[in-house]
Regions:
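Hydrolase active-site cap/lid region
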Residues: 59-110
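Eukaryotic short linear interaction motifs
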Residues: 2-4, 40-43, 74-78, 139-141, ...
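Short glycine-enriched nucleophile-adjacent loop
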Residues: 40-54, 66
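Active-site catalytic motif of lipid deacylating hydrolases and related acyltransferases
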Residues: 1-31
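Serine-hydrolase catalytic core
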Residues: 93-193, 199
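Extended, charge-rich low-complexity interaction segments
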Residues: 22-40, 191-200
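Alpha-helix termini
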Residues: 22-26, 51-59, 155-157, 194-197
Length: 200
């Protein structure tokens, strides 16, 4: 949760990832992003650094594909974190209200960063193909939000987008609950990108 509510920490993590990707041993390798849950929010920090810092700009051109499993960005944080934390409706409501209050109080600083990164994520500057995984009963990653993002990338950004929406599986547990379908979708995605598929 600290990474979600502290943009500076998220930026540090994003910087570490990008430094690895531009290292001598990795700088010529193709990249496939595979983000889970708040990895969608962390990916927005990666996108921001690639756009704003020249030293990371080469990574953008090397991203061949993007896999997002149950992505949660800024707008889903109060809903997602509170639902992940407790089954108790009162505790969920208190936590959701507390997070919303935190974001309102620190709007001048934290929320401004969140909104800018959310906008960047939804208007993804990386136009390589994307694959979404989500489920209809995920208590953290809202199905309508995931679907709207996939549709926007496909219809407004003209990206190649595939998706696998499961009837039922818990947050970021789609691989375990629907192992065969998940694995086949990833393999097909990588084959379509012309990237060798390793044995999973």
């Amino acid at each position: 949760m600290l990474q979600i509510l502290r943009p500076k920490k998220a930026e540090q993590v994003a910087t570490e990832v990008l430094n690895k990707l531009i290292s001598d041993e990795n700088k010529h390798r193709p990249v496939v992003i595979h983000g889970f849950s708040v990895g969608g929010y962390l990916y927005s920090h990666v996108l921001n650094l690639m756009v704003k810092q020249d030293r990371f700009s080469s990574v953008k051109e090397r991203i061949r594909g993007q896999v997002l499993d149950s992505p949660v960005d800024f707008h889903g944080i109060p809903y997602g974190v509170s639902n992940a934390a407790s089954e108790n409706p009162l505790v969920r409501w208190l936590m959701k209200s507390s997070i919303e209050a935190y974001l309102a109080i620190f709007a001048r600083y934290t929320t401004k960063v969140y909104l800018a990164h959310s906008h960047l994520f939804h208007n993804n500057p990386v136009r390589s193909p994307a694959l979404f995984f989500f489920s209809k009963d995920d208590k953290v990653a809202d199905v309508d939000t995931c679907q709207a993002c996939a549709d926007y990338w496909k219809n407004e950004l003209n990206m190649t987008v595939s998706q696998q929406c499961f009837e039922s599986s818990p947050h970021v547990s789609h691989f375990y609950v629907h192992n065969k379908e998940y694995t086949e979708a990833v393999k097909k995605f990588l084959r379509d990108l012309n990237i060798p598929v390793v044995t999973l």
